[in-house]
Amino acid sequence: MTGDYKEYKGYALITGGAGFIGSNFLDYAVDKYPDFHFTCIDKLSYVSNYTTVFLSKVLNQPNFRFLEMDLATNYKFLYQFMVEDSEINKITHIINFAAESSVDRSFIDPLYFTKNNILSTQNLLECVRILLGKKEELRNRLNFVHVSTDEVYGEQDENASVDEKSKLNPTSPYAASKAAVDLIIQSYRYSYKISVTVIRANNVYGPRQYEEKLIPMTLGKLKKFINQKSQKIMQDKITLHGDGLHKRKYLHIYDFINAIDLVWMKQGSEVYHSTLESKMSGQIFNIGSDDEIDNLSLVKFICDYFLYRKLSLKNLDYSKYITFVQDRNYNDSRYSLNYEKIKSLGWRPQIPLETGLRKLIDEYY
């Protein structure tokens, strides 16, 4: 795997870039940074419809290319790309989005989540470790941003929040796999002096999110309902776990992308202008929001706005649209991040939840 592109200021490897967050980031970054070259590696799973459809905006850009690869199982090809062909591919930045993220699926097949989420990132770290062993001059000039999750902290009591120094207390197989990866990253930083920054965000929502997540699931079922021949009965109701009162904080995808951009550019600027280890190396940043809402209230808001916009319906009988199902094996009561640290770099969320939801419905549904 070689490249024939011109010389660029930097060469970014974006893993998991064909999915929800990764593809939105690439739309933003490929356009904003024409002096950077972006290589996207993705295995093309169900969340991207097994295609590069979410990459249609960037596929033909001169500073972009796509490689289909499963990081967890194709170590040989990853090694060839990153190590053997390093003189050509010249990776200077890595942003790792690659992971399976469905909590519900992780309860069904926890072993798969362990294998996939841990090996995909550790294979990436191994290639970086070997590359830096061969090219010591890259040690303080290659920066790595890993996208983790707030779920590694477990649940928080009412009115409590966790900061970046809080202990990890995952409660689902998915969260445990992500926490394990965070610790493996920490070990590689200490043992092999790899410059890595970790990002942990609240629930991210926006266009292209797969319908297994609450917001797109709700919107998908409402869209199906209005396309029925008759709107008397909703044939496929919106499902809520337990009593629907579990709380989450929501962050719009565009706000999250701005936070990622801030972190990777700050880390990159530091390593480019110093032979010393970046101050960002080893740092963890919570990317949070103050928009907290329980699942039932969230779904009711979406139903109200969507059905009024599409069918002019008011004063809904929510029982016609919502059904309650057995709760998860374990369902965290709430997540809440203290994000003062990223605020100190100048970032704050700009899109309120209600505004973001209305815009999502108006433009995509």
Curated annotation (Swiss-Prot):
Xref: Gene3D superfamilies: NAD(P)-binding Rossmann-like Domain, UDP-galactose 4-epimerase, domain 1
Any one GO MF annotation of this record: oxidoreductase activity
Similarity comment text for this entry: Belongs to the NAD(P)-dependent epimerase/dehydratase family.
Swiss-Prot/TrEMBL keywords: Cytoplasm, Nucleus
Gene Ontology cellular-component annotations: cytosol; nucleus
InterPro entries in the record: NAD(P)-bd_dom (IPR016040), NAD(P)-bd_dom_sf (IPR036291), Sc_DH/Rdtase_CS (IPR020904)
One GO term of the biological process aspect: nucleotide-sugar metabolic process
Database matches in PANTHER family: DTDP-D-GLUCOSE 4,6-DEHYDRATASE-RELATED
SUPFAM superfamilies hit by this protein: NAD(P)-binding Rossmann-fold domains (SSF51735)
Main location: cytoplasm
Protein name: Uncharacterized protein PB2B2.11
Location in or out of the cell: Cytoplasm; Nucleus
Pfam family for this entry, one: GDP_Man_Dehyd
